[in-house]
Design a protein with these regions (language model features):
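Active-site beta-loop-alpha junctions enriched in small/polar residues
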Residues: 44-46, 64-65, 102-104, 210-212
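Flexible loop/turn segments at secondary-structure boundaries
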Residues: 48-49, 68-69, 106-108, 212-217
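A conserved active-site cap/scaffold subdomain adjacent to cofactor or substrate pockets
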Residues: 44-45, 49-74, 78
Length: 277
C-alpha cells in the first residue's frame, strides 16, 4: 500500500505506523506505466496464490506444478479475483497466474535431456537449499557439489527424469517416484505440454534455461528453435484472447478497485523544515 501510494500520489501524503514512518514528500521519478507497473508475488504454496488474488496481484508459482493441479489453482485464483475478498494492494489489478518450468528444446529428445536436465535439477535443488533444507556457510558451501552427491534423495533422480518417449509434465514418474522434467524435449513435446497448461487457464509459462552448467550456445539454440516452431501457435490470437479476458474480468476488476481506498491529497499547508544552518 505504501509503495503503490508513492507511485501515484503527488506528493506522497505520508505514512505513520509502528514499523514505518515517512512525512509528506514528492517521490520521483513516477512510473512510466500508469498507474504503476503490474504487481506480482512469487509463490511456492497454494495459500500464497490465494493471497495474491485477494490483493489483485499476479501470482508467479515456483513450485513446478502439474497442469491438473494448476487447474485448481487457476479456479481458486479467478474465483477470488471476482469475489468481495479481492481488495487490491495497488491501484490496478494484475489478474495473471504464471508458472515456472525448466526448458531445453532440441529436435532430438536425448540431446535436449543431455543439455538441460542437470541444470534444471540444480535450479530446483538450489531453490530448496535456500528455502527448505540447506545449511549454508557463505563463501564456503559448494551447492553444486552437494547437489551432485544428494540429488536423488531430494527428488532429482536423473534416470527418472531422462526417460524418453514420454508425455512431458512438470515431473516424470517411475514406480511412483517423481523427478523434475518440465519443458525439456522436442518441439512437439514442449508444444503439447504448453497446450495442457493453456487448457487449464494458466496465463503465462516462464522458462528457466540459464541454470547450472547449461551452455550459452545450447540455450540460444533452444530459444531460437522454440521461437520458430513452438511459439507461433501460442502467439497467434494472443491479442484477441487478452481482449476477451479483460472484457470478461472488467466488472470484477471495477468492483475490486471500488473497494480500494483512493489516492490521497496531501495538505497544501505542509512545509518541509529547513535542515541546514
Amino acid at each position: 500500500d505504501i509503495v503503490t501510494r508513492m507511485f501515484v500520489e503527488a506528493p506522497f501524503a505520508g505514512h505513520e505506523s509502528e514499523s514505518f514512518s515517512m512525512p509528506v514528500r514528492n517521490v520521483v521519478p513516477k512510473p512510466l506505466q500508469k498507474p504503476h507497473p503490474p504487481l506480482w508475488v512469487a509463490c511456492s504454496r497454494r495459500d500464497t496464490i490465494h493471497l495474491a488474488a485477494t490483493k489483485g496481484i499476479g501470482a508467479l508459482s515456483f513450485s513446478f506444478v502439474e497442469p491438473d493441479e494448476a487447474r485448481m489453482w487457476v479456479q481458486d485464483y479467478y474465483d477470488t479475483i471476482a469475489s468481495v475478498a479481492c481488495v487490491p494492494g495497488g491501484f490496478a489489478v494484475n489478474a495473471n497466474l504464471a508458472v515456472v518450468l525448466p526448458m531445453m528444446c532440441h529436435r532430438d529428445e536425448q540431446t535436449a535431456i543431455d543439455r538441460g536436465i542437470d541444470g534444471a535439477h540444480f535450479f530446483g535443488y538450489s531453490l530448496a537449499h535456500y528455502y527448505a533444507f540447506g545449511s549454508h556457510r557463505p563463501g564456503r558451501t559448494d551447492i553444486w557439489a552437494e547437489f551432485q552427491q544428494n540429488r536423488e534423495s531430494f527428488g532429482f533422480a536423473r534416470p527418472i527424469a531422462a526417460q524418453t518417449g514420454q508425455v512431458l509434465g512438470a515431473q516424470l514418474f517411475q514406480q511412483g517416484i517423481g523427478a523434475l522434467r518440465g519443458a525439456i524435449g522436442t518441439p512437439d513435446q514442449v508444444r503439447e505440454l504448453l497446450r495442457m497448461y493453456a487448457e487449464v487457464g494458466v496465463d503465462q509459462v516462464i522458462f528457466v534455461s540459464q541454470c547450472g552448467n547449461n551452455r550459452h550456445e545450447d540455450i540460444c539454440e533452444s530459444l531460437e528453435l522454440f521461437a520458430r516452431e513452438v511459439m507461433p501457435e501460442f502467439h497467434d490470437g494472443e491479442e484477441a484472447r487478452e481482449k476477451a479476458k479483460l472484457e470478461r474480468l472488467a466488472p470484477a476488476i471495477e468492483a475490486a478497485l471500488a473497494r480500494r481506498e483512493p489516492p490521497r491529497e496531501a495538505p497544501e499547508t505542509v512545509l518541509t523544515p529547513v535542515l541546514g544552518t
